[in-house]
A protein has these predicted regions:
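Bacterial N-terminal signal peptides
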Residues: 15-24
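Second-shell residues forming the walls of enzyme active-site clefts
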Residues: 119-131, 135, 223-236, 240-398
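Bacterial N-terminal signal peptides that target proteins for export
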Residues: 4-15
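Catalytic domains of carbohydrate-active enzymes, especially glycoside hydrolases
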Residues: 94-112, 184-196
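Solvent-exposed loop/turn segments at secondary-structure junctions
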Residues: 83-87, 115-118, 148-153, 196, ...
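Glycine-rich, aromatic-flanked loop segments that form ligand/cofactor-binding clefts
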Residues: 131-161, 181-204, 224-249
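Preference for extracellular/luminal or secreted protein segments
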Residues: 4, 28-100, 321-324, 331-332, ...
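Hydrophobic faces of well-ordered beta-strands that scaffold small-molecule active sites
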Residues: 75-82, 107-111, 142-148, 196-200, ...
């Protein structure tokens, strides 16, 4: 066969094979495009269904809130202490909408050391009795919370497994080990009946606050980000809400005794406050707890309260400041969860011109959703809220916003449920039997003890 003919034959064959390959590739590409189109279509359908479901849940939550008596709605803003350590007994009744002598139960209860028995069985029975009372009186369950930071600030010290202070954790454990530690603690908290932990402390430690924090901080800004995130995710993965504290910070003055006054340089504020809280806000913490401190930042001047006739023009503690709550925490840093005050009976407020009733009004207008009180009675503060709610449109709007945020939290963390058949918000199903929960508690405690035994932590 002549050379040119052979070359042409090879060229023809090559072109033929190339055509077949191109056709095959086009076919594969078309099939891939079709698969991708169908995948995107399915994803859009799922996303649409998810959005539709969220809209239904949101509408159902609004209806649920509207169905509540005013007494119960307004009470959602308060988190108070309670009597005893064995069986729940409410202490206050009020008249509401023609109904006489109705039990007044807050949105949440905080447990202190004297509320904690040294026997896990009694603690779990006590928390059960709180929920039983709410159910038997057709009330929304209050959330149950405590401080379990670690070290000396741990209401379950000696009952649950070892929980070292934050400083020790950052020095001795990796982030993965810290996540395991806090996960085991969360399982124990949940088994005993607690819904929310007022922890972790995510203040960056410096010379100005080291004496007050005393081991409660993870240390540097980097450590706060790494270990604060580990703690936050560990608790909330195990269905215990976490509350970051204290924003925007403290100094060496103990707010239980006096009013802290802080001044940040612009760079210091960005490094030690804004950046850590903004980053951690992306992990969707259930709450942030405000500090009772007068705070200013160089270049911004003294931050004054705004929109509060009774406090106009006065320097205001961060816990009562619309600037720090609405403008900075929510606006700039993007936080979407619950805002907690610190205890309004601390000397930082009470001895510096903000007695409880004035503090309650200021906190609500500033954007606080949960007013923390170490007292066991709150009828006086509740009556003030009721009076202002009925006569002040701005106050009413702030209360309505807070009530909805609290109820959304309760829905998200299982104190309320969305019934798909009736499309209504209903009380959560009863928790597992006490025996089963205690089995979880002791199992997690054993693992907790074994994990820290090599460090001499018991």
């Amino acid at each position: 066969m002549p050379y040119k003919v052979r070359v042409n034959a090879r060229l023809t064959a090559a072109l033929f094979l190339a055509a077949i390959l191109l056709a095959s590739l086009c076919s594969c590409s078309l099939k891939a495009n079709e698969r991708e189109r169908r995948t995107r279509q399915a994803a859009r359908a799922i996303q649409g269904e998810s959005l539709a479901l969220e809209e239904k849940k949101s509408a159902a939550l609004d209806k649920y809130i509207q169905s509540l008596a005013e007494r119960e709605r307004l009470a959602q803003l308060f988190v108070i202490n309670l009597e005893g350590d064995e069986k729940f007994s409410f202490v206050e009744r009020v008249d509401d909408g023609g109904q006489k002598d109705r039990p007044l139960v807050p949105g949440g209860y905080i447990f202190f050391s004297f509320n904690i028995s040294n026997e896990p069985e009694k603690i779990a029975a006590f928390t059960d009795s709180v929920r039983d009372f709410a159910r038997s009186n057709d009330l929304t369950e209050p959330f149950l919370c405590l401080d379990a930071e670690g070290g000396y600030v741990n209401r379950l010290r000696g009952v649950a497994g070892p929980l070292p202070e934050n400083e020790w954790v950052a020095k001795n454990l990796s982030a993965k080990e810290a996540f395991l530690l806090y996960s085991l603690n969360a399982i124990q908290l949940r088994a005993l009946g607690f819904d929310l932990n007022l922890s972790p402390v995510v203040e960056v430690q410096n010379e100005g606050n080291a004496a007050f924090l005393d081991g409660r901080s993870f240390g540097s800004a980097q450590n706060v980000l790494v270990y604060g995130s580990a703690a936050l995710l560990a608790y909330q993965t195990n269905n215990v809400a976490a509350v970051l504290k204290h924003f925007p910070g403290n100094n060496s003055v103990d707010p239980h005794k006096a009013l802290p006054v802080l001044n940040f340089s612009a760079a210091g504020f960005e490094r030690d406050v804004a950046e850590p809280f903004e980053a951690l806000a992306k992990d969707a913490p259930a709450g942030v707890l405000m500090s009772h401190a007068l705070v200013s930042v160089d270049g911004l001047g003294q931050e004054l309260s705004q929109g509060q006739a009774s406090l106009q023009g006065q320097k205001t503690p961060a816990s009562l400041s619309p600037y720090w709550i609405r403008s900075v925490l929510r606006g700039r840093l993007g936080f979407k969860g619950l805002v907690f005050s610190d205890d309004i009976f601390m000397a930082a407020l009470e001895k510096n011109g903000w007695p409880s009733e004035r503090a309650v009004k200021g906190a609500i207008l500033a954007g606080v959703n949960c007013i923390l009180m170490s007292e066991k009675r709150f009828a006086g503060e509740w009556k003030l809220v009721k009076k202002l709610y009925e006569g002040d449109a701005d106050f009413r709007a702030a209360v309505d916003d807070s009530v909805r945020r609290v109820m959304k939290f309760k829905l998200d963390f299982g104190l309320l449920e969305y019934d798909y058949l009736s499309q209504k918000i209903v009380p959560a199903q009863e928790r597992p039997p006490l025996s089963e929960r205690l089995e979880h508690f002791y199992g997690a405690k054993k693992l907790n003890q074994e994990a820290l035994e090599k460090y001499g932590q018991r």
